[in-house]
A protein has these predicted regions:
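A short, hydrophobic C-terminal helix/tail in secreted or cell-surface proteins
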Residues: 165-170
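Flexible phosphate-sensing "switch/lid" loops adjacent to ATP/NTP-binding sites
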Residues: 2-14, 18-164
């Protein structure tokens, strides 16, 4: 069974991304197969791979983990366009442009959560440790109903809330 740990913070810019990057490198140095994971990221800074596009943050974390950069690590990328509209990328491919209301009401809890869980499951089958990164703050009450990146993902993946117990390496 994969071990997973989620890093959440009090706000955007709190240091979650750099902490996950560091943890990926530390545990990779210890000999574990490690992958980062962020269910949904909103950023115009992207990494363009061979036939896919994900958040640059998860690509850098994958480099830290010494693992292949893959759309599984960031199944949903939102690239803001302004006026509450974003280009939505799913599984590394452009899906469509959506207004926030359409995204929240018609996509995120239906298809978005399912896609994210499938990606996490695939990563967990090929890695010993998956570090999940939250987004912004899990305490933003105006977004909690639709927030798949923080507590919904923590509950669905049964991440460790207090500590990570690892098997010893021979």
């Amino acid at each position: 069974m994969v071990k997973s740990l989620m890093i959440q913070g009090t706000s955007s810019g709190a240091g979650k991304t750099i902490l996950v990057t560091a943890l990926c490198r530390i545990f990779s140095d210890m000999g574990y197969t490690v992958s980062p994971f962020k269910a949904q990221n909103m950023s115009n800074f992207s990494y363009i791979g061979k036939n896919f596009e994900i958040s640059r943050a998860q690509a850098i974390q994958a480099v830290g983990a010494r693992t292949e950069i893959t759309p599984l690590q960031n199944p949903i990328l939102l690239k803001p366009l302004g006026n509450y509209r974003s280009s939505v990328f799913v599984d590394g491919k452009f899906f469509k442009k959506m207004y926030a209301s359409d995204y929240y009401e018609n996509f995120v809890l239906k298809d978005g959560l399912k896609k994210s869980m499938n990606s996490f499951k695939k990563l967990s089958e090929s890695h010993e440790i998956v570090f999940l990164e939250g987004a912004g703050s899990p305490a933003e009450i105006n977004l909690q109903k639709y927030d798949i990146t923080n507590m919904k993902m923590a509950k669905k993946t049964a991440v460790s809330y207090t500590h990570l117990t690892l098997p010893t390496k021979a």
